[in-house]
UniProtKB/Swiss-Prot annotation:
The keyword Nuclease applies. This is Micrococcal nuclease. It comes from Shigella flexneri. Belongs to the thermonuclease family. One of its GO terms (molecular function) is endonuclease activity, active with either ribo- or deoxyribonucleic acids and producing 3'-phosphomonoesters. It comes from the Bacteria. Keywords: Endonuclease, Hydrolase, Nuclease, Plasmid, Signal. InterPro entries: SNase_OB-fold_sf, Staphylococal_nuclease_OB-fold, Thermonucl_AS. The gene is nuc. PROSITE patterns: TNASE_1 (PS01123), TNASE_2 (PS01284), TNASE_3 (PS50830).
Length: 174
């Protein structure tokens, strides 16, 4: 009887733990780490959730503008409480989501702002493409405007897409 009760408690504890992990729903938490220009760690109920900003692709760390993109994401989110709207979980277990952080606007007004969009609008990231097509039409419009204005990475006439850079780097090591 005691072992059955212990097993039942263990199952109940596991269910509570699984249900309390916000990996399958929208959540709020504090950004505790910036991995690169499109990936952050968010602390939620003493658990760290890795979040990949959906629909954008920032330069890699070893790539031109990689450090600047990472720094800009840090400026916008580090130690801030953010809201994440989850789109899906990728094959690496990362939450793909839209990140909203409080930004202060002229006149002192603060409002939650789409950080994914800011990164693309400021030329710190590309609109993400899947088989050559943007996954979000609005992000692609932001990218075209940033490119037109030569903002951020678009100031470099030789800016290389992260997916091409990753492929070239992988081929160089093989």
């Amino acid at each position: 009887m005691k072992s059955a009760l212990a097993a039942l408690r263990a199952v109940a504890a596991a269910v509570v733990l699984i249900v309390s992990v916000p990996a399958w729903a929208d959540f709020r938490g504090e950004v505790v780490r910036i991995l690169d220009g499109d990936t952050i760690d968010v602390l939620v109920n003493r658990q760290t959730i890795r979040v990949r900003l959906a629909d954008i692709d920032a330069p890699e760390s070893g790539q031109a503008f990689g450090s600047r993109a990472r720094q800009r994401l840090a400026d916008l989110t580090f130690r801030q409480e953010v809201q994440v709207t989850e789109k899906e979980v990728d094959r690496y277990g990362r939450t793909l989501g839209v990140v909203y952080a409080p930004l202060q606007y002229p006149g002192g007004q603060t409002q939650l702002t789409n950080i994914n969009a800011i990164m693309v609008q400021e030329g710190m990231a590309w609109a993400y493409r899947y088989y050559g097509k943007p996954t979000d039409a609005q992000m692609y419009e932001y990218e075209k405007e940033a490119r037109r204005q030569r903002l951020g990475l678009w100031s470099d006439p030789n800016a290389q897409e992260p997916w091409k850079w990753r492929r070239a780097s992988k081929n160089a090591t093989n």
